[in-house]
């Protein structure tokens, strides 16, 4: 083509591998006019290098929630850490997790599950947030998830601090309280911080129980450890009926027995998975807001998630990745790997239900 040709053309390949011939100056506009992909498969690292392209969760197509009526599992970022009381930075978690998720592939090596064959999956983008107003942000996040839930999409979220789970549950658990498998170093059932603050990353599950979103008798917390402010930090949840497996009991029981106990507690009812990366020993996940030594290993975490296959799962999150404290990127890579583990379990459950 001549240098002076104003109508020179460029061939561009989208995630569906269909090429479009368009005037070069219209490429950007046209890209954002496309609302639905023709394929919900991720881009292969054999077709586009992992360091190239625009980062989406697991290299899936981006679909706005308003256009996501075909999507069955939506991966969502919640870039907010306004509930953090110690080391901030989890607001940057979704971006870093997206970047590292280029390492994800299509087939689970142990189970053989192919989540992208079982379900239509997409990156639904980030929720809107207000970094200077907690309650406004909670409302914005809930409104985003209301749209997701109303379309029957199963959400898999990346935080963000652990307070983000509360507005997700407000959208997801409106019909009835649900059970939960909660991996964490902390119970997150405190009442208030600094006398007045009801909404922090240490209070979401107390609020969820009070609001009738979470059934404490169908809730199991795994990996709890670390010093307390007072005895009441632990006692309130136990009084509500939460099954708390502290790290000492975890080590005594072993992974298989912990899985069996978790399955017994949640039963056959609708169940949510919430995974705080600080359940892991900081050797494996240093990039988090409230690290506690003596945690579980990454391999144990993988086995625990695989042990939830067959449950009635309605959604999940992975939270508290703080990139400013994750110099090597290992914590984000761990989060990506665990999100893929959870995605496989969710996809199997969703496909069985359909």
PLM regions and their residue ranges:
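Active-site histidine-anchored catalytic micro-motif
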Residues: 139-140, 145-146, 150-218, 222
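Short helix/loop capping segments that flank catalytic or ligand/cofactor-binding pockets
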Residues: 84-86, 191, 230
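Residues at secondary-structure transition points
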Residues: 8-12, 23-25, 165-166, 208, ...
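Short, structured patches in soluble enzyme cores that scaffold and shape functional sites
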Residues: 182-185, 221-226, 246-248, 320
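Active-site environment of divalent metal-dependent phosphoester hydrolases
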Residues: 189-190, 227-229, 323-325
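N-terminal amphipathic/basic-hydrophobic helices that include classical n-h-c signal peptides
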Residues: 1-32
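Catalytic cores of soluble, metal-dependent hydrolases
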Residues: 32-80, 86-156, 163-175, 236-239, ...
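Glycine-rich phosphate/diphosphate-binding loop of Rossmann-like nucleotide-binding domains
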Residues: 225-229, 233-237
